[in-house]
Every structure is written in structure tokens, then in C-alpha cells.
A protein has these predicted regions:
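Basic nucleic-acid-binding interfaces
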Residues: 2-17, 22-94
């Protein structure tokens, strides 16, 4: 719905994708990768694919808070990407 404040708007609601490739060759690396996944889940992310987690956010401001949290969780090694899309864009994915 597009309308007054408080109404659901598919352009205001956001989805965050966290995609990552972390090294898991040594035991400490595996532990850091597992802890990163656990911390994502503690912050409300759910597994979409093995290294892709998603989370719904009620607004862009809420998404910004969760993006900052993820940034603080990122291990020193590996690659982590965050993609923010509107609910409308999320609904249009194939």
C-alpha cells in the first residue's frame, strides 16, 4: 500500500543479504566462520543458502543499524558483501 504514515510501503521495507566466503582450512578459521554465522542468526538473519543470509528490516534506518552490526562481526580474513534491497525488489526476484 502507498499512503499515509504507518501504512505498509514496499519501497520503505528493506531486505538485507549478507553473502560471504570465509576461509575454513584450519580449525581456528572454521571456528571464526561458525561464530560469524551464529552471530548473524543472533541478529535475526536466516540462512537463504549456505553462505547467504537474509533479514527483513522495517525501514532503511533499521537496515542501517543491522549493516553496522554486521560490519563489526566481519572476520579479518575472507570476503563479506552486504546487499540492501527494497521489499518490492525482493518480491520481484526470480
Amino acid at each position: 500500500m502507498i499512503g499515509s504514515q504507518g501504512a505498509i510501503n514496499s519501497y520503505r521495507l528493506m531486505w538485507l543479504y549478507v553473502m560471504f566466503d570465509l576461509p575454513v582450512e584450519t580449525k581456528p578459521q572454521r571456528k571464526r566462520a561458525a561464530q560469524f554465522r551464529k552471530n548473524l542468526m543472533k541478529d535475526g538473519f536466516g540462512m537463504h543458502q549456505f553462505s547467504v543470509y537474509i533479514r527483513h528490516c522495517a525501514s532503511g534506518e533499521s537496515a542501517a543499524v543491522h549493516i553496522e552490526r554486521v560490519k563489526r562481526l566481519v572476520p579479518d580474513e575472507g570476503m563479506v558483501s552486504i546487499l540492501k534491497v527494497t521489499d518490492k525488489q525482493f518480491g520481484d526476484t526470480i
